[in-house]
Design a protein with these regions (language model features):
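N-terminal initiation segments
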Residues: 2-388, 394-405, 448, 490, ...
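An anionic, glycine-rich sequence signature occurring as long contiguous blocks
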Residues: 112-149, 396, 407-505, 512
Length: 516
């Protein structure tokens, strides 16, 4: 029989007929496409066209995954990201995406060029001079009174009663909106308004699911004595649990301006939750002097405008988060979801020539500037303009750097070294150094001198720069945070992207509560 090829319209009709034949329960209580964020918003680009790189090939480089490992033993290439390719000519959604992108502000074209003194700083031979570091003045540590507090009270710091009440209100509003559209649905017949006690019980069961993973969600309510976990059926019915998960909401859909409006916020569904977390994380605890900025990837394989593809990550597709964490404990102080290269990031006091990655760093660091913090970043963020600006606001930094960044000394970049050798040059407070172990490592620092230390490996003793040793020690904060969460991750597939991110946020609150 010859193969039959369907047009897009015919395929849509067939798929719609198949969808209508599904069971009523699965249709009504599934995570419907009402909250699907269409790919037509725009195609995000993680590779950061605003980065201060010398050539266009920078956007194609991949970032190294092992920040917590010794950088002298790993690839110094930085991790990039790329959107899932789509064809705007063959797909109407792609055509709408092109129109949407045309309405976005062309900030890259408006950005002024990098000043000459930052593109061509004067580099001189280093002379073991340590920069005049600013004093550390932050009032670090816990900012709340924990006397006589029970373990649950630490979680209540990040999930207080007023926030849970807000989530209940938005969840009930969304449930009523769905019921109004389908008054004869299963949801309309069985829905009762959710209370804060219901929400707490729901979150407790969600947390326990991460501790006791099962292949399918309905298995938590099975009556099979081999697989049965009695607390689930004793506390809530499976239908009620699915209703709560389906209607879980954090903002009112009626307040969304729509994707065609230039003022549309891609993170509208989660914006109240993100703002709340950044507020309570900063109020509850002030980190120690050593901090790090890196990114996490929340696995997600659905259709989403801000979904990223990062080959070096274990879960290559997902939603990217930038996190500022304390190096010693992994406490998450501030987070930011990547929204695309056309998102508006305007941290106060930022120089006009700063690119996207620099703006992200300044936005995360804004509450901690002028206090003497020591920042550690990898080569995705490190640049001469950023480090010089951070030093001017009393925040020295250290990080590996890509060889094609503007302003680096050519003599350091192209220097041929033998294993164990170090070469460096200095431009005022900024030190550029190259170290050869198994491979070349380029680094910039405004914290250290070119001081070296003897390090013993399994087979020999080698001399390493102190800057490299401390980078290896303090850079793994975000990896440490992810390591804490990895045994408790809820990796179950979900259609609705913001619900998967929201469950990650709830678990992040649990982790921070454990740390403090």
């Amino acid at each position: 029989m010859a193969k039959r090829f369907y047009s897009a319209e015919e395929a849509a009709v067939i798929l719609q007929e198949d969808s209508n034949s599904s069971s009523e329960f699965e249709e009504e209580l599934s995570e419907s496409d009402i909250d699907w964020l269409p790919e037509s918003e725009s195609e995000s680009d993680l590779t950061d066209s605003d980065s201060e790189s010398a050539g266009p090939s920078t956007a194609q480089q991949s970032r190294s995954e092992g920040q917590a490992r010794d950088i002298s033993d790993t690839d110094t290439a930085s991790e990039g990201g790329s959107p899932v390719p789509t064809s705007s000519n063959a797909n109407p959604r792609g055509q709408r995406a092109a129109r949407s992108r045309q309405s976005m502000p062309a900030r890259a074209a408006q950005r002024p060029p990098l000043p000459y003194e930052l593109c061509h700083p004067q580099w001189l031979p280093s002379n073991m001079e340590t920069p005049n570091l600013p004093p550390f003045t932050a009032r670090r540590g816990l900012q709340v009174d924990t006397t006589n507090m029970q373990p649950i009270d630490f979680l209540n710091i990040f999930l207080p009663e007023n926030f849970l009440q807000y989530v209940c209100e938005q969840t009930n509003i969304y449930a009523n909106q769905r019921i109004a559209k389908k008054p004869t649905s299963v949801l309309a017949a069985h829905w009762t308004p959710v209370t804060t006690q219901d929400l707490k019980m729901f979150l407790g069961l969600i947390f326990n699911m991460a501790r006791c993973p099962k292949p399918e969600q309905q298995m938590y309510w099975t009556k099979n004595p081999i697989h049965c976990i009695p607390i689930y059926s004793a506390k809530i019915s499976r239908c009620r649990f699915q209703m709560l998960l389906t209607c879980l909401h954090f903002s009112n859909n009626d307040d969304d301006v729509g994707t065609d409006n230039p003022a549309h916020n891609r993170l509208f569904k989660l914006r109240p939750f993100i703002d709340h977390l950044n507020k309570v994380f900063a109020e509850a605890y002030v980190p120690e002097q050593k901090i790090a900025i890196d990114e996490s990837l929340i696995p997600y394989h659905g259709r989403l405008a801000i979904k990223q593809y990062i080959p070096s990550k274990r879960s290559r597709y997902g939603i990217k988060l930038y996190k500022l964490c304390e190096s010693g404990s992994g406490y998450t102080f501030k987070l930011k979801i990547y929204e695309g290269k056309d998102s508006l990031i305007e941290p106060p006091g930022r120089p006009p020539y700063m690119g996207t990655t620099e703006r992200i760093v300044l936005d995360l660091l804004n509450p901690l500037l002028h206090q003497g913090y020591h920042l550690y970043v990898d080569n995705f963020y490190t640049s001469v303009p950023l480090f010089k600006h951070l030093f001017s606001v009393q925040t020295p930094a250290c990080g590996t750097v890509r060889a094609n960044r503007k302003g680096l000394p050519a003599e350091v970049v192209h220097k041929k070294l033998k294993r164990g050798e170090t070469f460096s040059q200095r431009s005022n407070e900024l030190l550029a150094l190259k170290f050869k172990d198994k491979q070349d490592v380029l680094a910039l620092t405004t914290i250290h001198s070119e001081e070296t230390r003897m390090v013993r490996t399994r087979t020999q003793e080698i001399v390493k720069p102190l800057a490299i040793m401390q980078y290896n020690k303090f850079m793994g904060a975000v990896d440490l945070s992810d390591q804490f969460l990895s045994p408790y991750r809820l990796d179950r597939k979900r259609k609705i992207w913001y619900k998967k991110v929201a469950l990650y946020f709830f678990q992040l609150c649990l982790q921070n509560a454990f740390i403090i």
